């Protein structure tokens, strides 16, 4: 039914676009800058002294069978990915150089996409966004100045698809293991009246998930309308998605995996009135997010151009969760009135978010100088609130029982100036200066119960930050095929909402500061390229993952005074023939905390005990990552065999050997064949085998510990959970372009 609806809508739009296109002969000479730039010129080029990788739409298309964007980038240098459901669809995330997603800046057309409070990007709210992208650039390290939260390990710069000259339509469908499927319809009007274009996409993605009950149901859209003339490009872009995802964030201990299997999922589990294990059907996350962008690119002269944008994002949703034997006082109930202190219950947590702003940049390019200056201002307003629709000891509550509500507000203003100057032939200097001001407030009552005051946690946070982030470097291109560069960057970043609300100490978390040194060399000719990038990232007050999760499955972090990440990224590509390419890259790194002191709590909350471990590995930061890909293209057939090896990762910063993610090596095989049928531009069929050699592995987890007192002696304990990933699984696809 859904596929029929998609095809019907596509045929209507495609037919209409043909009618209008006939009336306006396409004259490409009257349309300038159709491949418009984003509102902020934050892209790195071969003259920018930073480490970066570009991934084209063609590369994305070959592997885009429904997995989220992080999984489409997993073979780029220093990248590892995670998946709650175990197969790359649903709640997924990405780490670069060991840095988690809350410290990776993500933009679309230069507009910030990270959540203003959590700093993460929930890809589940942007399903199939890869189908509407022109390309993606990943900058590793501090990178160039950009909008939104600071880049502390990397930035991901996405550029949405260009408008086309000719009417077109496309239909893609995929199906595979775990009932995973994706249906996508894309249409383009072509050029209307020599000035206008309209492009649209709708997608549906679903899966039962590898992990038990980890089902995902996703819908999304993309729509852009553009106006073009000789000196002006004006685009309105909107995209959004709705998701319904069953919780799978509890993961499983090794003991649970042994007893119940690797797919065991405790989320929603309870004991019914007959003493049987049951699962709550509505243990789902339900969220809708809609993004709107209005982007203007204006050429003022042959050397000067102006970019401006307005943007707005609306998000709202909720999730329900069955909780067993909960203390009723934690939910605002009077135990005396109810007649019991504890009861099973269902809690419903809701969010209503608004994020918007504007940005402006001026670009100058003439002779030896390429310079940009710009500014941006963004504001966020978000309500967090929750209620308990059902309590076992009472039944359905006759009235709405809200037990917490708080509001977060954030204003973020930044200004920057950047210039690349050619000093002599082949040698250029790069300077990038940014000032950023942030005001962040949270007011109200949180969902954490504070036993020190015997009441819900009160929030009255008002924090201000002023950051100056300078960057400078040299880039030297010599002897035709050689390039060398060096850069030094300073980056600073404010804490996230969870750093304030989940901390076990009274004082505010500290802002982080990064000093990033990068030195690289590349050789690139027609058939062979090789390169190396050395980096040293020294942090002051880095907020490192502790290994623990808060009550809603989000990773917790804490400041450490001194830490660093250093390493070398190696990469090579060999093209000995038109039909064969061998690509490989590796990251060898050392990620350490200086003089780490672990704080262990009685019952994980009171009476802290400190243990000094000296210098330790930073959690979730592998020392070695290796990627290899063999790519064959012959006539209309293509094949790629890609392999990733990730070394052992500690899940806490204390280096306990019983709290690690073991090393793993996973290979994926992709096959594709292109041909034509009558009335089509092209047809492509594809088939993928993921985890070809059936590796049993986990790519994420949590860990923690505490102590209790027995007979006057402290007894320490530790625990851990693991995100099991799917064994060998399959996906097939077909694509029609008209």
What are these regions (language model features)?
Residues 22-62, 101, 533:
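Short, acidic, small-residue-rich periplasmic hinge/interaction motif at the N-terminus
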Residues 287-449, 475-477, 481, 487, ...:
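Face-selective signature of the C-terminal outer-membrane beta-barrel domain
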Residues 112-140, 159-160, 256:
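Short acidic/polar hinge/loop motifs at secondary-structure boundaries
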Residues 582, 592, 647-651, 673-738:
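C-terminal beta-signal and adjacent terminal beta-strands/loops
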Residues 168, 175-206, 211-248, 292-303, ...:
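Transmembrane beta-barrel wall of Gram-negative outer-membrane proteins
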Residues 70-112, 128, 134:
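Extracytoplasmic beta-strand/coil segments of soluble accessory domains associated
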Residues 425, 536-538, 558-653, 737:
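Gram-negative outer-membrane beta-barrel transporters
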Residues 299, 305-311, 475-477, 483-489, ...:
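Membrane-embedded beta-barrel scaffold of Gram-negative outer-membrane proteins
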